């Protein structure tokens, strides 16, 4: 299986409010950047949306190392998700996106690594800037 790195970040102005997401996918020396947003959302939803959209791009099963500054996403992937599924996602927030994650992550091996946000991590900073830009675009369209 190919070794892929995914860096992602989500932003929400107001939380909830206009939001944006961004992800960088890296395979060897190749990179692809994606971004987007929603008019009314939360930072956690945008973080997870970034990951889901990145996973949709992959065409074959991969070993993925995910780098995120979201404890929520990292803990969910590494620890909580198995129990959430056993309990059919009872009382889980953002259940639509977690169910989508289960679908789009099928066949992949994913390890989530938490990185401290706003701490000079180059890819995280790039994703953060893009996610904020996407959120700001939506402020202009919703006012």
UniProtKB/Swiss-Prot annotation:
GO terms for cellular component: cytoplasm. Transmembrane segments: none annotated. Residues 1-136 form the RNase H type-1 domain. One of its GO terms (molecular function) is RNA-DNA hybrid ribonuclease activity. Its main location: cytoplasm. Mg(2+) 2 binds at residues 9, 128. Mg(2+) 1 binds at residues 9, 47, 69. It holds the Pfam family RNase_H. It catalyses: Endonucleolytic cleavage to 5'-phosphomonoester. Its cofactor is Mg(2+). InterPro entries: RNase_H (IPR050092), RNaseH-like_sf (IPR012337), RNaseH_domain (IPR002156), RNaseH_sf (IPR036397), RNaseHI (IPR022892). The keyword Transferase does not apply. One of its GO terms (biological process) is DNA replication, removal of RNA primer. Belongs to the RNase H family. NCBIfam families: PRK00203.1 (NF001236). Monomer. This is Ribonuclease HI. It comes from Helicobacter pylori (strain J99 / ATCC 700824) (Campylobacter pylori J99).
